[in-house]
Structure formats: C-alpha cells, structure tokens
Amino acid sequence: MARAVHRSGLVALGIATALMASCAFAAKDVVVAVGSNFTTLDPYDANDTLSQAVAKSFYQGLFGLDKEMKLKNVLAESYTVSDDGITYTVKLREGIKFQDGTDFNAAAVKANLDRASDPANHLKRYNLYKNIAKTEAIDPTTVKITLKQPFSAFINILAHPATAMISPAALEKYGKEIGFHPVGTGPYELDTWNQTDFVKVKKFAGYWQPGLPKLDSITWRPVADNNTRAAMLQTGEAQFAFPIPYEQAALLEKNKNIELMASPSIMQRYISMNVTQKPFDNPKVREALNYAINRPALVKVAFAGYATPATGVVPPSIAYAQSYKPWPYDPVKARELLKEAGYPNGFSTTLWSSHNHSTAQKVLQFTQQQLAQVGIKAQVTAMDAGQRAAEVEGKGQKESGVRMFYTGWSASTGEADWALSPLFASQNWPPTLFNTAFYSNKQVDDFLAQALKTNDPAEKTRLYKAAQDIIWQESPWIPLVVEKLVSAHSKNLTGFWIMPDTGFSFEDADLQ
C-alpha cells in the first residue's frame, strides 16, 4: 500500500510539475536589457530618459507623443487655449482608476501639477512647470491651468514623459518616498525593484484600455556592457535589448530569431566645456578643441556608422533647428589656437561621461587620443547613474568638478525650447537643470524667452536661429554626433520599439 501511494504521489507530482512548466511557458514574461541603471521611479524627479521610460510602465500623462513625436491624447480627451495664451482648459477621460483603486479626475491633475510647480519640493523637473500660476479642478473631468505668462510650448510640456499622473493618495501616503512606490494609471504596476539589479513590473488587471496590456510582466534589467546585452538576446535571457553594440549589429542581423532595428533619433551626443573655469573660459581653447576631434572617424570607431556628425546644437529633426558647416578635423589649426590662447604645450584636464556603457567608453578613449595629439592630457571617468546624479546634476557652479563632460540630450517634448533652454539658458546651471557648460549669454536668454511668447512660426524661427547662431559661434560644446537608435528584439515580441528620444513604447507589446 505504501509503495502504491508513493507511485501515485510521483504521478501527481509529475502532472503538477508538467502543469507548472506549461503555465510558466505560457506566461508572457519579457526581459528588457538596457544600458544603465535607474535613478528613481518618480518621473518628476528624474533627469535621465531611461528612468522616465521605465516609469511609463506605471504612469501616463494627459498627453503623449507618437512615433513621429506628434501630440496625442492619453488621459485627456481635448484641450483649448485662451486667446492670450495664458489659460489651458483640459477635458479628461472618465472612468479611469489608479492602481490603488482611487479615481483619476481633475483633483488628481491639480495635485500633481501643484506638486510639480512648487519650488519647495525641489523636484529635478521643476523647470518644466515653474510657469504654472495655478491649477483648478472646475469639475471632475475639467481642469483649468493658468500660466504666469504666455508659453507657446506648454502643451508639449504636458506631453513630456515627466508629466505623469501619480495617485494623490499614494503621494500623501509615501511623500518623498514616492520614487520607490509608483502608483499610476498605466498598464503595469510594480512587482519588485532590486535597485542594483532590476525593476520588475506586472500586468495591472484594472487597466482602463480594453484588452491591454498583453504581457504578464516586464523585467527591466540594467546591463552596462554592450556585448553582454547582445549575448542575453542571443541566448534568450532577454527579449529586447537597447542600445545594441554597433559593432555587433551585422552579427545580430544574421540571427533568424532576432530582428534588428535602426530608428531615427533626436539624441545628440556632445562634450560640454565648463566655460567658467580655465582654460575653457577662453573662446580660442574651445574653438581649438572643436578642430581637434575627427567626427567622421568617431562615427566609424564608436558608432560603427550608426550616427551622423553633428551640424548644430539641436538635432535636425527638431522644429526650428539650425544647421551649420560641420567643424573640420584640423589638428594643426587646433595647436595654433592653443598657442594663441597661451597654451603652446597644451594642458591637463578631466573628461567625465554621463554613462559607463561600452559605447561611452569608446567615445572617451577616442576623444582622449584625439586630444593627446594636440597636447591635451585628459583623465577620463565613466560614471554610473548614481555618480552622475551626485557629482554633476547635484552640484552648483562653485562646487562642481565638471570640466569636460560627455553626455547626450533628447528634447522629449519634440520642440525647440526643450532642446535649448535646459542646456544653454543662464538660469539652468546644475543643480537646476543640465547646462553643464555653465554657459551664460544675456542675448541667448532673451531670444529663448521671447520665442515662448509668440505663436508666430516665422518669429519663432527668427528668434531660435538668433540664439543658435550665438551658441554655435561661442562654442560652449564640442557637438559630436546625432545617433541612430539601434535596438534588437526576439521576433516573437511585437509592439515594442524605441522612441526618437530614446524612450520606449510598449503599450501594445505582445509575445507570440
């Protein structure tokens, strides 16, 4: 009898194991290998695109941007703007719940915009919302937002990934810890966040769009090494990987189970120079460094051809971008300018990077070698997200150790103000925003401010051109390249792609 029971138990165990294996196989679980870690899951307090991209798992905004960076309605149904450009009235969708069961309504919008526009909260994205004078809940589905002054790009601010609707109940419950406890209206809710290893999100059963999401879970896994990221895709450890190491693109393209995608981008890579510090306060030094870098060679060496040399300080696909004659590679001219500037034997400096993945390392090494050829000794440091937040984003001009800084920017609003003001306006030095050159020019400030007060395209073109002309001439940057976005995914994964600003779109993602 005992032997018979034992056999029955084995059979039952075998059936149970088979069923569990079947269920596990049937579960639609996707692993996404990304290039760096996340700083926070509070979109209003994140300066990096990746953290905001992952936060889209939980959160949605009133508006969003599609693949072509065109405005689309999300939690809002429509909007109107007053003739004076001061008041925006937004009509909301009805019947939407936050993941904690509370209602999304006009009061929730007010709570979020009040928080975002209050400087006392010290949120990293405050500058996006500082022009809001007040937000009113007219009725449960109507919000009126009054600005301090006309701001023609404001609707694009509401479409920015930072402008997420967080549950007011969660804001009250978690306070400053909301970055660890995301609660939104999005398709997924938080399962686990291991801060050194991964963020796992699971399907939100109460999501308001019928039939979505189609995946059961997404695990966002930071993998700094490019080759490891590609290998995870080939072994099936990951179903989506971005960025793909450019040198491995051709190899992955040959894999019958993998689809490679090279997408258009608004991601500009550049090196800022701290113009408040010697020797970068000398325009001739900045000009010399621009001549010292062979951009076409950089495209080949670090990006395997998946980039184009920069022809301005705003990527060409952004409205009102101006293009200029690219800086030629001329090390002889660079040495002449350094001599004229009082540095005939060059100088020593530091070159930091905002990322530590393999492509960033290649850019650092290439730039270090190029600078050495004109007598400049650059000590390079590739930072992770935590180092960047502490040493670059968190320190003002007097405390900052930034000298040369390799980084990138994508104007996630899809318009020119967000491509220029955060990076060049005098009021946007760190820790306020990302003007890591500590650049300041009153004319540029005035042109950028005036451009926000007009809706006339011709006048905006004139003003943005004038600002870019000055910036290009004064050269607080070494503009390098505009990237192409190379990602890869398992062929059985659909509806998962990279946005031009390097964010992710995955609302319709499915695993066949």
Swiss-Prot record:
GO terms, biological process: dipeptide transport
One term under GO cellular component: outer membrane-bounded periplasmic space
Subcellular localization(s) per the UniProt record: Periplasm
Matches recorded under SUPFAM superfamilies: Periplasmic binding protein-like II
Keywords for the protein's UniProt record, in alphabetical order: Periplasm, Signal, Transport
CDD domains associated with the record: PBP2_Ylib_like (cd08499)
Assembly, per entry: The complex is composed of two ATP-binding proteins (GsiA), two transmembrane proteins (GsiC and GsiD) and a solute-binding protein (GsiB).
Known function: Part of the ABC transporter complex GsiABCD involved in glutathione import. Binds glutathione.
Protein name (Swiss-Prot/TrEMBL): Glutathione-binding protein GsiB
Organism expressing this protein natively: Escherichia coli O157:H7
Lineage: Bacteria, Pseudomonadati, Pseudomonadota, Gammaproteobacteria, Enterobacterales
